[in-house]
Amino acid sequence: MQYPKNILFIGNSATYVNDLPGMLVSLCREQGIAITEKQIVKGGRRLKTHAEEPAVYAEIAKGYDAVFFQENGNAITTEEERQKSLEGCKRMVEAAQKAGSQCWFYVRPPYGNDLAGLRSFDQCILFDRHFTPAAQQWNVQCAYINRAFAAAIKDHDIPLWGPDNAHTGVQGAYLAVCTFYASIFGRTATELNTAYGIPQEAAAVLQKIADQIALEGIIPWET
């Protein structure tokens, strides 16, 4: 399997808080996997807005091995917003595929607080139902960070969010990075070192969850 060596992330603070791409690069390096990352991110930015920016297409045209797209959760709470999200996604996906990139949806984690009346676990289902059909239709891969969070919520008592209860805390961030790793490389997250100062015992739990989602294909709300 040909692994991506340079990766572009397009999204918002769900990508840059705790620097998920940078931590992925660091943990990969420790495993002898050399990758680089570039981020086009801005707080609160929606994919439909990214899709209106010429600079985004100029960066996509450079031909990254992989491009990850990450949405604002608020952008898919109504049918109108969901349609706008998909329209923006499709434009950027088509541009990235034309440039020879493998496209991925970074299916984001839920918020720790309610979103449009949905609790965190149910947000995971909403995000899944938004992106999975489009991914299947457009030949896009998915990194199901939402499913990893759903599994953690369902089966464990793990502090996943930071003080604002919206962005990931260190354990949520590590869970996301482990899920990226297992999804992209098809390798077990248990081979990764811990990070963010997380104790090894806690890291092992998060690694196992990532493997269940990325390697075993578990969908928490169907089990």
Task: Walk through the language-model features, giving the residues of each.
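Conserved SGNH/GDSL esterase-like catalytic core that processes O-acyl groups on lipids
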Residues: Y3-I10, A14-R91
